[in-house]
């Protein structure tokens, strides 16, 4: 049988035809590789310790992907050193999609401003793949606090500098930076009281040692369920599942549009073929749409969070701008 080519090929001279065929073949190779992906076990390195919320959620997604792909997806815990150990483990890995990294938005957007010397440059060393989860922070106050709304809290803070104090789990933490963002949004100046451990912070809130702190439902939940603290508002665009009685910051009289969230994502080594990145995105989106995943996420106070590459980069730019501006204003460095 005589091969049939596109008419455009028939008008090409011999060398041009050969070059065109070679280019078409090369262009098709990544797609073919993506269709076959994965061809061996996939490793996902996480900076979060075993049993922590982001790690448990990652294992849920990994288990689903293992079944979908017919290949093991192995979670490799490398906690410590502000995530640098995990990051170094993947930075120089083969860019074929079989080595992935979990990071959170603080590591991606805040650390470049908190550390003068970083062992990585995010977009130089990694390909953003997709977020997998998100949760919003609550304004947490003592159960007996005189503040009943964000209007009350901001009015007290506007009475004068340092009339209100807030706690965080350490200098440069999302809780610290988020509170500084709230100061900017409300034109106030509050006293920062840093703690060494997250658990110490919410005990301190419950004991009325500090006026308030940002906290997630997972991190601040034990003291809230014990009746020692309560949620004044949630820093989200709308009320969140599980706490329909808690108003947003804006609904409670705080600044309109104020949001503070934590989210984690998957990244691949730089140079991973676009077709493979897109296949992982598509399959993760499929996993996150499953009802049992949504239910298990909800039990951990997470929501499935998926973005394509363009949306992911846009979110990173937005977070980097907010974190960067605030960290520069605070003039803090962790090295």
Sequence positions of predicted segments:
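N-terminal (or domain-start) structured segment
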Residues: 34-124, 163, 187-216, 223, ...
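An extracytoplasmic/periplasmic, membrane-proximal ligand-sensing/linker region
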Residues: 39-41, 188, 225, 274-335
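C-terminal lobe and pocket-closing loops
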Residues: 220-289, 321
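Bacterial N-terminal signal peptides
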Residues: 16-29
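Hinge/capping helix and adjacent helix->loop/strand transition within the periplasmic-binding protein
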Residues: 89-98, 105, 113-200, 249-251, ...
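A ligand-binding cleft/hinge motif common to bilobed small-molecule-binding domains
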Residues: 106-117, 176, 180-185, 212-246
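N-terminal secretory signal peptides that target proteins for export/translocation
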Residues: 1-13
């Amino acid at each position: 049988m005589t091969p049939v080519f596109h008419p455009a090929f028939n008008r090409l001279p011999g060398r041009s035809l050969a070059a065109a065929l070679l280019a078409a073949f090369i262009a098709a190779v990544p797609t073919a590789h993506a269709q076959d992906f994965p061809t061996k076990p996939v490793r996902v390195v996480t900076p979060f310790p075993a049993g922590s919320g982001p790690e448990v959620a990652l294992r849920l997604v990994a288990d689903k992907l293992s079944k979908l792909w017919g290949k093991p997806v192995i979670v490799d815990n490398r906690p410590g050193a502000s995530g640098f150990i995990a990051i170094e483990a993947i930075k120089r890995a083969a860019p074929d999609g079989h080595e992935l990294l979990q990071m959170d938005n603080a590591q991606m957007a805040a650390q470049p401003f908190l550390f003068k010397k970083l062992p990585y440059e995010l977009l130089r060393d990694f390909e953003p793949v997709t977020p997998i989860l998100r949760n919003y922070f609550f304004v947490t106050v003592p159960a007996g606090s005189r503040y009943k709304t964000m209007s009350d809290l901001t009015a007290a803070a506007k009475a004068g500098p340092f009339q209100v104090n807030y706690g965080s789990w350490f200098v440069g933490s999302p809780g610290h930076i988020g509170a500084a963002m709230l100061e900017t949004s409300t034109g106030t100046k509050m006293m920062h009281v840093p703690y060494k451990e997250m658990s110490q912070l919410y005990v301190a809130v419950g004991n009325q040692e500090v006026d308030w702190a940002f906290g997630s439902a997972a991190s601040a939940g034990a003291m809230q369920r014990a009746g020692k603290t309560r949620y004044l508002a949630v820093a989200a665009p709308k009320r969140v599942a599980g706490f329909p009685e808690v108003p947003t910051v804006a609904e409670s009289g705080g600044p309109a549009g104020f949001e503070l969230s934590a989210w984690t994502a998957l990244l691949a080594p730089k140079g991973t073929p676009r077709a493979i990145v897109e296949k992982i995105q598509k399959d993760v989106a499929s996993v996150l749409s499953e009802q049992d995943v949504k239910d298990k996420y909800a039990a951990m106070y997470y929501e499935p969070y998926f973005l394509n590459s363009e949306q992911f980069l846009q979110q990173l730019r937005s977070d980097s701008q907010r974190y960067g501006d605030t960290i520069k204003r605070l003039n803090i460095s962790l090295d």
